[in-house]
Amino acid sequence: MTLFMGGRLAIMTMPYEVIAENGFRDGDLGTLIDVARSVRGVEVAAVVKQLTAEKKFRASLRSSVDFDVAEVAAEFGGGGHTRAAGCTILAGSIDEAAEKLQNAITARFE
């Protein structure tokens, strides 16, 4: 997990290699977002997962403040609600996907 914006944003990544080696399924990873949200000071949390070897990355976003994560998800063709949303990010690597998400969030954060 990496913290940004003085600890207000937390982004966790789960690469395909880790998922495949451990036999995880998408449903097994649902509580990761809660780990990121539990860090003191985190207002927006995201988990980026690579579920297959393809260069498609699924992101889950949550907000504990008046920050519309659905707007961020919509930028990548996703959707959801103000405080809970998701999307698929196309990128060359999981780090690139996380960086795209970080940039989209920080651009909207006040």
What residues fall within each predicted segment?
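Hydrophobic helix-and-loop "lid/oligomerization" segment in the mid-to-C-terminal part
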Residues: M1-F76, H81-E110
